[in-house]
Design a protein with these regions (language model features):
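A short, N-terminal "cap"/entry segment at the start of jelly-roll beta-barrel domains
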Residues: 2-61, 128, 142-148
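Histidine-centered metal-chelating micro-motifs
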Residues: 72-74, 92, 109, 113-122, ...
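Short proline/glycine- and basic residue-enriched helix-capping loop/turn segments at helix->loop/beta transitions
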Residues: 62-66
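Extracytoplasmic low-complexity repetitive segments enriched in small/polar residues
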Residues: 50, 69, 92, 108, ...
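Ligand-binding loop in jelly-roll beta-barrel domains
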Residues: 100, 114-141
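Glycine- and acidic-residue-biased ligand/ion/polar-headgroup-sensing regions
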Residues: 78-97, 107
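A short beta-loop-beta micro-motif enriched in histidine and acidic residues
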Residues: 58, 70-85
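Short acidic-glycine-tyrosine-enriched beta hairpin
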Residues: 67, 97-114
Length: 148
């Protein structure tokens, strides 16, 4: 029985794969590829919260959200009114029934308490994005509620 002929010897392709993997690991490319396969989650930092006695059951909350490159939010909603201001990078937002918008530093976006946020992501695969959100929301309810 004759061996199967290929355009490249099998031994060479294995060698190339092994050397390529070692080089990628040495230079951190493997971790960058892993980050691309599963985007990192957004980092949310609470800046300030305050009960709103004039609005019973409501509180004001200010947060920053940092999207790593390629970060994507799951579909969700928020229990209040959100006023978004982009600080750096570029983000893409859309609520159900609305148009997808790309926002850059200095631009704003609004989400209402009945909106389902169907798109929330970093527009870049290589640069981070950061925005601040001021919420007027139901007191004691998480600001992020996963939904379908």
């Amino acid at each position: 029985m004759k061996p199967i002929q290929t355009s490249q010897p099998v031994g060479l392709s294995r060698f190339t794969l092994i050397v390529g993997t070692l080089i990628a690991a040495a230079f951190g490319v493997g971790s960058a590829m892993a980050a691309t396969a599963e985007p990192l989650e957004a980092k949310v930092t609470e800046l300030f919260s305050k009960d709103l006695p004039e609005c019973p059951g409501k509180e004001g909350l200010m947060i920053t959200v940092e999207y790593p490159p390629g970060s994507v939010d799951p579909i969700h909603r928020h229990p209040g009114h959100g006023f978004i201001y982009v600080l750096e990078g570029s983000i893409i937002m859309q609520v159900r029934g609305g148009q997808e918008v790309t926002l850059t530093p200095g631009q704003t976006f609004y989400e209402g308490p009945n909106d389902v946020h169907v798109v929330g992501r970093n527009a870049s695969q290589t640069k981070p994005a950061k925005f601040v959100v001021f919420w007027v929301k139901d007191k004691g309810v998480p600001v992020f509620i996963p939904t379908k």
